[in-house]
């Protein structure tokens, strides 16, 4: 206890630690574990009333990874040579891994390069239309968009004020 400063060790903290170490059921933050349930069981959250995933509501479902779950049908007899369960999405359809070929990846890279080229060209055209000082460095995309918004607003107000003067 000498490693902790005295201010951190008030009576509440010491009582809580003592209750934890003695497994006293009188502390409100402690919960009783049913017999036979290992500590950290995923179904424990459901028993405590916490919202959980599908695997917590039915023991036939087991989480595999991400949004995938593995369903084990207790009535279905499987042989050793077959798979030990079907991996399915949450919609119940079989999960099929998408295989991307080298040619598809190359085509996607070309499309992405073309998209970025067109986007950069559009920003360059916008930079030429928006007035800036000649000695300024090249504006970033966000600076270009913000300056364009200000410029368009200014030009709109200028036109509206000119129309009001002509009308009166």
UniProtKB/Swiss-Prot annotation:
Ranges annotated as spanning the membrane: none
Region ranges (Disordered): 65-88
Known partners and oligomeric status: Heterodimer with TCF3/E12. Interacts with the bHLH domain of TCF3/E12.
Keyword Iron-sulfur in annotation: no
Protein name as it appears in the record: Fer3-like protein
UniProt record, GO biological process: cell development; floor plate development; negative regulation of DNA-templated transcription; negative regulation of transcription by RNA polymerase II; regulation of dopaminergic neuron differentiation; regulation of neurogenesis
Pfam families: HLH (PF00010)
Gene assigned in the entry: Ferd3l
SMART domains hit by this protein: HLH
Organism: Mus musculus
Described purpose of this protein according to its UniProt entry: Transcription factor that binds to the E-box and functions as inhibitor of transcription. DNA binding requires dimerization with an E protein. Inhibits transcription activation by ASCL1/MASH1 by sequestering E proteins.
Tissue: Detected in the developing central nervous system, in particular in embryonic ventral neural tube, brain, and spinal cord. Detected in embryonic intestine. Detected in embryonic and adult thalamus, hypothalamus, midbrain, pons and medulla.
UniProt keyword annotations, A-Z: DNA-binding, Nucleus, Repressor, Transcription, Transcription regulation
SUPFAM superfamilies membership: HLH, helix-loop-helix DNA-binding domain (SSF47459)
């Amino acid at each position: 206890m000498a490693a902790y400063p005295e201010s951190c060790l008030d009576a509440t903290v010491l009582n809580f630690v003592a209750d934890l170490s003695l497994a006293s059921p009188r502390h409100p933050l402690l919960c009783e574990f049913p017999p036979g349930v290992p500590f950290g069981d995923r179904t424990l959250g459901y028993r405590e009333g916490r919202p959980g995933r599908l695997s917590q509501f039915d023991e036939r479902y087991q989480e595999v990874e991400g949004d995938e779950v593995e369903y084990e049908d207790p009535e279905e007899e499987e042989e050793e040579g077959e798979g030990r369960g079907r991996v399915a999405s949450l919609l119940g359809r079989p999960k099929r891994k998408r295989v991307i070929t080298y040619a598809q990846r190359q085509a996607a890279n070309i499309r992405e390069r073309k998209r970025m080229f067109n986007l950069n060209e559009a920003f360059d055209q916008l930079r030429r239309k928006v007035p800036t000082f000649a000695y300024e460095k090249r504006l970033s995309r966000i600076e270009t968009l913000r300056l364009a918004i200000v410029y368009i607003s200014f030009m709109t107000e200028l036109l509206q004020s000119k129309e009001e003067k002509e009308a009166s």
